[in-house]
A protein has these predicted regions:
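Non-catalytic, usually N-terminal nucleic-acid engagement modules in DNA/RNA processing proteins
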Residues: 1-93
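Catalytic cores of enzyme domains
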Residues: 84-85, 90-263
């Protein structure tokens, strides 16, 4: 496809409700740092990981293959500002309002692409173990930002206060330019000091352990177990919503502490 089509896709993504959008090559995404490190990370269970029909965690080696004909991947981001916390409130089996918005954005954008550009598209599950991808890595490859000291995607426009989804495209699209953007180099990292469980206090990963030089939180100082413990506590402190489902309000202190993208 011509560059004109890529520009059309990114413009259409915003018309369909995305705050940001970018394009990456499937081959590049499949070799992203998280994909390379995944099999070396040990136990990957916890809050937000998928389970089967018997409520058992799905083994991380069980990763469905993407369609062979898929050549490109579109990443869409939705701004999640501090004054709209409800976008991220988990409400039982229905997930979060923000994720439902992203699903609809991807669906309508896919329909537009198939009609206007005559190319096939394929939905992606949120979970890697069910055919999804590591969305932060994909977003970096799609030119949306960089991975910060808080192990989150940092965008120039909104900092880490975005939520992501993606889908696959049969067409071989030109990827969006990678961003020359690194706001963390001279930052005192308030995201780390504000963490209530000090999940980013001490390095727990090395490049040798994970088989990639790009390790979590840049220097390996991201303890997923501690972060997961905070999320478990958030679940225990959840409130019952109008639908009688527990409404979980997960910690976002490291997001709010980040100065990037603030007015």
């Amino acid at each position: 496809m011509s560059l004109h089509n890529e520009q059309q896709i990114l413009a259409a993504a915003k018309e369909h409700g995305a705050s940001l959008a970018g394009i990456a090559r499937v081959a590049d995404v499949g070799q992203s740092p998280s994909h390379l490190a995944f099999e070396n990370m040990g136990d990957y269970t916890g809050v937000g990981t998928p389970r089967d029909d018997k409520k058992q965690h799905i083994p991380q080696e069980v990763v469905p293959a993407w369609p062979e004909e898929a050549r490109s991947l579109v990443v869409v981001a939705l701004e999640h500002p501090r004054n709209k916390p409800e976008l991220d409130w988990w409400d039982g089996n229905k997930g979060t309002p923000g994720n439902r918005q992203l699903i609809q954005i991807c669906k309508s954008l896919r329909q537009w692409m198939e009609s206007a550009l005559n190319t096939s598209t394929f939905p992606m599950h949120y979970f890697v173990q069910k055919g999804g991808t590591f969305l932060k890595d994909a977003a970096v490859l799609a030119g949306l930002g960089c991975i910060g000291s808080n192990n989150q995607l940092i965008t120039p426009e909104y900092g880490p206060r975005v939520r992501l989804r993606s889908f696959l495209v049969q067409a071989d699209l030109e990827p969006s330019p990678r961003m020359d953007f690194d706001p963390c180099t001279d930052c005192p990292a308030p995201c780390r000091t504000v963490c209530p469980v000090q999940a980013m206090h001490t390095p727990v990963w090395t490049p040798e352990q994970l088989g990639t030089k790009n390790i979590p939180a840049r220097d390996g100082a991201y303890d997923r177990g501690l972060c997961n413990g905070q999320m478990e506590a958030d679940i225990q402190n959840s409130e019952t919503s109008d639908t009688d489902q527990p409404q979980v309000k997960y910690c976002r202190k490291c997001e709010f502490a980040c100065p990037v993208g603030k007015p």
